[in-house]
């Protein structure tokens, strides 16, 4: 099995006043495992599955979620194929399967905040989301545990859908698990920001961030793509990542301010979203 790269692979030396760098960062997980996920021992044979998704195991919650998403995607295609697109369900099918439609959420169809996490718009959409969420999710599960992984995936994913519904309300239909996927990316970016002062190979980290931003750019276009949800998931995931690392021994000097800001953001976002979705006159 491929080794999951830890934060110590990026860190050069303990910051002043800290001697626990190597011990703390070796608890699994790494910044942006999507692009620099693992290291293999010399002569180790790694299967293509382990190369694509290091540390994969079928009992992982993220794997189970992925299988459910595949089943839902196949069912949505069976319900109706969109013309002139590659294996894409029709808009009517997306509505039937619970797409994010703010006007319907306002009248009580609350399930439309979570159902989009299992929907995909076309073949490229589901393949990209599955690869990213499995690759990052496995690393997050190793570091934070499966319960926290699920809390971030569904909690921040639903919150991002709420933000999207609050911002783009009238005549909108949005779908896709990308809001939750961007939440996972946000957590990884937060980790990277928190250990930046201790990173030895910053060039690799910069390349990783650039590739991440390219993914953000590419994933934000297309019919029914939820660009606001992507940004909401990324920002709220970043805030969650700041909070999740409060016990780190290599926190930067600005951590306390960042933690307070993240807590305020995570508390205010659902309240403001509910106000704009359910109380503020729209359309």
From Swiss-Prot:
It is a multi-pass membrane protein. Its EC number is 3.4.21.105. It catalyses: Cleaves type-1 transmembrane domains using a catalytic dyad composed of serine and histidine that are contributed by different transmembrane domains. It is found in: Membrane. Keywords: Hydrolase, Membrane, Protease, Serine protease, Transmembrane, Transmembrane helix. Residues 1-11 have a biased composition (Polar residues). It comes from the Eukaryota. One of its GO terms (biological process) is proteolysis. Residues 1-26 are annotated as: Disordered. The keyword Transport does not apply. GO terms for cellular component: membrane. The active site is at residues 178, 230. Its main location: membrane. InterPro entries: Peptidase_S54_rhomboid-like (IPR002610), Peptidase_S54_rhomboid_dom (IPR022764), Rhomboid-like_sf (IPR035952). Pfam families: Rhomboid. GO terms for molecular function: serine-type endopeptidase activity. It is an enzyme of class 3 (hydrolase). The chain crosses the membrane at residues 62-82, 114-134, 149-169, 179-199, 205-225, 227-247, 260-280. Serine protease involved in intramembrane proteolysis and the subsequent release of polypeptides from their membrane anchors. Belongs to the peptidase S54 family. PANTHER family: RHOMBOID-LIKE PROTEIN, RHOMBOID-RELATED. This is Rhomboid-like protease 2. The gene is ROM2.
């Amino acid at each position: 099995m491929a080794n999951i790269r830890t934060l110590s692979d990026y860190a050069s030396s303990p910051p002043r006043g800290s001697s626990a760098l190597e011990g703390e960062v070796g608890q699994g997980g790494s910044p942006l495992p999507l692009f620099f996920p693992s290291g293999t021992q010399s002569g180790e044979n790694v299967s293509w599955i382990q190369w694509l998704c290091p540390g994969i195991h079928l009992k992982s919650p993220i794997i189970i979620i992925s299988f459910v998403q595949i089943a839902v995607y196949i069912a949505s295609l069976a319900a109706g194929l969109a013309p002139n697109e590659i294996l894409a369900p029709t808009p009517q099918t997306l509505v039937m399967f619970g797409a994010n439609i703010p006007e319907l959420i306002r009248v009580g169809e609350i399930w439309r905040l979570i159902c989009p996490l299992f929907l995909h718009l076309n073949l490229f959409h589901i393949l990209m989301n599955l690869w990213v969420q499995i690759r990052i999710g496995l690393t997050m599960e190793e570091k934070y545990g499966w319960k926290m992984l699920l809390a971030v995936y569904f909690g921040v994913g639903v919150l991002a859908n709420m933000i999207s519904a609050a911002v783009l309300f009238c005549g909108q239909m949005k779908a896709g698990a990308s809001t939750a996927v961007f939440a996972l990316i946000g957590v990884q970016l937060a980790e990277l920001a928190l250990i930046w002062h201790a990173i030895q190979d910053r060039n690799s980290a910069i390349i990783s961030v650039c590739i991440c931003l390219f993914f953000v750019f590419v994933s934000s276009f297309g019919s029914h793509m939820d660009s606001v949800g992507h940004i909401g998931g990324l920002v709220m995931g970043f805030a969650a990542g700041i909070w999740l690392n409060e016990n780190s021994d290599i926190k930067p000097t600005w951590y306390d301010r960042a933690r307070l800001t993240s807590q305020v953001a995570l508390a205010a976002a659902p309240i403001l979203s509910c106000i704009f979705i359910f109380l503020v006159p729209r359309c």
